[in-house]
């Protein structure tokens, strides 16, 4: 499971160093193979260990290519999916088209989200966190049943 937010840097070739606390697990569980694609709802990237991505692919394959909405989701997620192999130094090369989509330049937030990571431009990430906190503090609506059961 991946958790926490870590600032990492992209080098001039578009590579980022995976924090050491994740490297051994990614090598053990995925042989250092990951898949990066766009997030279709937010200006960030999604980075999955290959076994986790294969589960997503299976789910996507069950969608109908005749349904325009389902086909659009398939096209966006699969069409942007790029395999990334962690090198001996623990670095991943993020494809230029993906970096451009998320506005990634130098400082990048690697955010653990259970079975995957999100990659955010640092400034965009902190803006998003502020917006989310503001929204929660001003929320007056009913919580979903699942959120009501969440006790922190």
UniProtKB/Swiss-Prot annotation:
It is found in: Cytoplasm, Nucleoid. InterPro entries: MraZ, MraZ_C, MraZ_dom, MraZ_N, MraZ_sf, SpoVT-AbrB_dom, SpoVT-AbrB_sf. GO terms for biological process: negative regulation of DNA-templated transcription initiation. Keywords: Cytoplasm, DNA-binding, Repeat, Repressor, Transcription, Transcription regulation. It holds the Pfam family MraZ. It comes from the Bacteria. Residues 5-52, 81-124 form the SpoVT-AbrB domain. One of its GO terms (molecular function) is DNA-binding transcription factor activity. Its main location: cytoplasm. NCBIfam families: division/cell wall cluster transcriptional repressor MraZ. Belongs to the MraZ family. This is Transcriptional regulator MraZ.
